[in-house]
Design a protein with these regions (language model features):
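N-terminal leader/targeting and accessory segments in enzymes
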Residues: 1-80, 84, 260, 331, ...
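Active-site beta-alpha connecting loops in nucleotide-dependent enzymes
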Residues: 35-38, 295, 313-386, 413
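Acidic, Mg2+-coordinating active-site environments of NTP-dependent enzymes
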Residues: 57-65, 171-308, 330-334, 359-369, ...
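Short acidic-hydrophobic, aromatic-tinged amphipathic segments that line or gate anion-handling sites
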Residues: 69-73, 387-396
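Phosphate-binding loop of NTP-binding sites
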Residues: 77-211, 215-223, 332, 406, ...
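ATP-dependent carboxylate/acyl-activation modules
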Residues: 96, 296-298, 415, 419-420
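Short amphipathic alpha-helix with an adjacent loop that forms part of the alpha/beta core around
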Residues: 163, 395-403
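Peripheral docking tails and interdomain loops at the edges
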Residues: 407-423
Length: 425
């Protein structure tokens, strides 16, 4: 195989595509990727022994093998293959990026579109330079729409992913302080995320946007094919979970979700707007949103034997931390407790942002305890003697196990592994 067209024919005839020899099935296409700690190009013989029919590799030993597409850069070839596959598709593709809420928004859009169409979508948060191509290559001939999440922690990454995915509809959820170590500044975050809208502008796609967010409004200022989020309003409720109302030209609707946190109303607005754009009936949209249950530590409410716990432990940066604390503080519950994991990739903002969080905790009424995990918090231990500090999540288990009758916010990044504390609560 010498051309991308020949490789594409091999891809279409293969039983599946794999980048892991442990998951190879008979007749699959194996793409050998090189990472920081592994190089799958050294495992070609094993891949073929396990049943691979074709392979993409930079291993010169297999350059003349007719089953092999030889290339100096297997990742770029994977991306080129995904882009070529995308070019063969005539279905709507929804692209999503943003600092916070993109995975929940992706999940909500997916369930909404799935209520009417056969929908392909990003699995989990496979939203990077490898995950986006794999998502695109998972789109089958009978799929009617696709939803593609795009993440980034360095400048230029969204532009590259959007050029591969070529979305017909796209949205940026928001912009905030995250991955500053990679982006360099908040402006760097804005410029990177805005690339999704620039891609839509270049192809005539539809830009969906939050008209309440000035940063997002600035991104689409010079574009005509824009659709603002449908208006929605929170419905006051004693329930822990979010309820809201919205209306179209004919009717008003009330939706009761399984999501914790008022900030999720924006994610729901995005899903409703995209659903309407794609022709999904309001009744189906509402039922899909009401039927969605969050997983993987995102906006979940748990009642344990001893405590009520809000679990938001998959992603943490200053803006998402503030949103979670705003929602937590607004609840009328007594005997509150926070368990927070340190935020990563903040560069020069690491110290001031963690200090801001600690100072914020002092102002929360009815806060009985604060358990802080990670060195970025612990460096301020002397200034906050009433708080408990631990270097690692495992070190906090004993303190956590003593909590009873508390209303608890468990907030951090997936790298904090705060989910390991749930059984102790």
């Amino acid at each position: 195989m010498n051309t991308i067209e020949e490789l594409y024919q091999a891809f279409k005839s293969a039983s599946c595509l794999s980048t892991d020899t442990r998951n190879i099935s008979q007749g699959s296409l194996f793409v050998a990727l090189k990472g920081e700690r592994f190089d799958a190009n050294t495992m070609l013989a094993d891949a073929f022994q396990r049943g691979a029919a074709y392979a993409v590799t930079s291993n010169a030993e297999f350059a003349s093998d007719p089953r092999v597409f030889f290339t100096p850069d297997t990742l770029k070839t994977l991306q080129d293959l995904a882009s070529y596959h995308r070019d063969q598709l005539s279905i709507p593709v929804v692209g999503i990026t943003g600092t916070n809420g993109k995975t929940t928004t992706k999940e909500l859009i997916t369930v909404v579109l799935s209520s009417k169409f056969k929908t392909a979508a990003t699995k989990g948060n496979l939203n990077n330079h490898i995950g986006v191509p794999l998502t695109l290559l998972s789109i089958r001939p009978d799929d009617e729409v696709a939803v593609v999440e795009m993440g980034a922690n360095h400048p230029g990454e969204i532009a590259a992913l959007a050029a591969i995915a070529k979305p017909t509809i796209g949205l940026v959820t928001n912009v905030g302080l995250a991955h500053i170590q990679g982006f360099g500044s908040l402006q760097g975050v804005k410029d990177t995320k805005a690339a999704l809208y620039r891609q839509l502008i270049s192809t005539g796609g539809t830009a969906v946007y939050d008209s309440d967010n000035d940063d997002i409004v600035d991104m689409i200022a010079d574009y005509d094919n824009i659709v603002p989020y449908i208006a929605a309003k929170k419905v006051p409720s004693e329930s822990e979970t979010l309820s809201f109302e919205w209306a179209d030209a004919s009717n008003a609707y009330q939706v009761a979700t399984n999501l914790c946190g008022d900030y999720n109303i924006k994610n729901a607005q995005a899903a409703i707007t995209v659903g309407l754009l794609c022709g999904v009936e309001p009744e189906k949209i509402n039922a899909a949103i009401e039927g969605y249950t969050p997983t993987n530590g995102r906006s979940q409410a748990l009642q344990t034997a001893r405590n009520h716990v809000i679990v938001d432990a998959y992603n943490a940066n200053p803006s998402s931390m503030n949103a979670a604390l705003d929602n937590f503080e607004a609840r009328p519950n007594a005997a509150k407790c926070v368990i927070l994991g340190a935020m990563g990739e903040l560069g020069p903002e690491q110290e001031p942002q963690h200090l801001k969080v600690l100072n914020r905790l002092r102002s929360i009424p009815n806060l009985d305890c604060a358990i802080l995990i990670g060195q970025a918090f612990a460096m301020f231990k002397a200034q906050f003697p009433s708080f408990q500090f631990f270097p690692q999540t495992a070190d906090a288990k004993e303190a956590v196990s003593q909590l009873s009758g508390k209303y608890i916010l468990l907030k951090g990044s997936n790298s904090n592994h705060l989910d390991q504390l749930i059984d102790s609560l």
